């Protein structure tokens, strides 16, 4: 009977983690609170701290008015740059002028870093603003890592920076070695 109660208690404690909710330290001040973002109601938000406008969903996902549906597409770095260029220039692309914005691009690593919610991990992004941030490979990635691609190149053009949204850490990868997910940004109009 004690084993039964222990198992039930553990299930009750761990159940919130199974749904993909971020793990947050409630004693820390929020670094990316929802109030900082202006929701345009069209799948985009403007960060009032930086003036940057962001797509709420990663490429491959679709905004349905309240969340991101589908699975994000992972791109190799050059592909990520090319798809961003197509979105800007190809009027037949589904995301051309998405949310009324015409200059979508890959963010640099400093821009991505402004999105990190330092009080949380799994994900380290504000899930109210960027829903299903941990989506990938047909599931919510609870034990893996999710990386966002940046346009920042380092080490004599052989590596590019990425943001690990699982932890909020920044890292570098050899260009062309691994595909990453893409969240597009635009400058203040």
Name each model feature, range by range:
Residues 9-11, 54:
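Extended rod-forming repeat segments used as scaffolds/tethers
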């Amino acid at each position: 009977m004690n084993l039964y109660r222990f198992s039930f208690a553990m299930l009750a404690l761990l159940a919130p983690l199974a749904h993909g909710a971020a793990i947050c330290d409630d004693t820390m001040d929020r670094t990316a609170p929802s109030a900082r973002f202006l929701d345009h109601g069209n799948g985009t938000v403007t960060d009032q701290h930086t003036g940057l406008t962001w797509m709420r969903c990663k490429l491959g996902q679709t905004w349905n008015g309240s969340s991101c549906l589908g699975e994000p597409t992972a791109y190799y770095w050059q592909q990520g740059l090319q798809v961003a260029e197509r979105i800007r220039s190809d009027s037949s692309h589904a995301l051309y002028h998405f949310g009324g914005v015409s200059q979508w691009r890959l963010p640099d690593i400093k821009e991505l870093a402004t999105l990190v919610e330092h009080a949380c991990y799994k994900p380290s992004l504000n899930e109210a603003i960027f829903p299903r941030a941990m989506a990938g490979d047909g599931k919510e990635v609870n034990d893996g890592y999710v990386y966002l691609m940046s346009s920042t190149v380092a080490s004599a053009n052989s590596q590019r920076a990425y943001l690990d949204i699982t932890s909020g850490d920044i890292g570098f990868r050899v260009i062309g070695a691994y595909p990453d997910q893409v969240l597009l940004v635009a400058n203040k109009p």
